[in-house]
């Protein structure tokens, strides 16, 4: 699945739900350049809200609420169904410590070494 160009997320999630076992979106997207800040953008269907996620991690895990239970709800008289939420988690590649191909992209931090990564979430309304 290629999200290099804007896509309607609902269509992608419905396609995945019909095609694959995970019943929605649950993917790790590898970013092209480990030194760049590659933004992830979500824009509401009415173009009134935009979320931009910037990070210098090498990948981003994106998943929808594929298996939401309808109970309990955090808000009285509101039930949530599948795909009512989305999560965007910049980070290292999943299971990289056990995958030699990914070792360079997922360094092991040793005692005394510095760790310097950032994640920025920016919300805009129009």
Task: Please state what every model-predicted region is.
Residues 2-126:
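Active-site pocket scaffolds in enzymes
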